[in-house]
């Protein structure tokens, strides 16, 4: 995260004293719970995609996480990474990475109780943000607030946006047309490569393919 937590003090001696086991997962739990207490929050969230790879370790600390699986058309994800300053750039590698991430998330879904796993489709979110956020709040047993839709006005969003071009959009309202950009900006060859690698996952998640089957 390019933006440090504000108004939160993390003392090493207090963190160590609060740990019930000597693991990185326990440090993770204690630090986030400390931050939540200091801000008066009843919930805390870590948005790292890598959490899905360490779910068993995280759960070994005694917490029972709610998992939010935000998924997007992988071809638009690939296009975004091709423009970013980080990450793979070749469409084959991007397709492989996206496929592995979705497979890992779906494996986690299979081993998680339905009331602790929320599938959130990106395209549905940007088309009907309030409806989807109300559904998410219901899932988390949290009251919905209209302030949710004002995220881009927060000081944290402003601080994040100036940290680099990758985060420029966090100071903008939801971009309702931010979908299917790959149709305009990826070549038909790149689309075919992506679909040959990850077409099965695209279909499983409800997306349609652009390339005729005999060309995959």
Predicted regions and their residues:
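PAPS-dependent sulfation machinery
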Residues: 1-46, 175
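PAPS-dependent sulfotransferases, especially Golgi type II membrane carbohydrate sulfotransferases
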Residues: 13-16, 21-22, 82-85, 102, ...
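Short beta-strand segments
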Residues: 45-47, 69, 119-121, 148-152
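Conserved phosphate-donor/acceptor-positioning beta-strand/loop module used by diverse small-molecule
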Residues: 47-50, 57-82, 194
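Short, solvent-exposed loop/turn segments at secondary-structure junctions
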Residues: 50-53, 73-77, 84, 124-127, ...
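PAPS/PAP-binding and catalytic site of the sulfotransferase fold
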Residues: 57-62, 119-144, 170-173, 194
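Short, conserved active-site loop motifs that form the nucleotide-linked donor/cofactor pocket
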Residues: 65, 115-117
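A glycine- and Lys/Arg-enriched "phosphate-lid" helix/loop adjacent to the NTP-binding pocket
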Residues: 68, 76-100
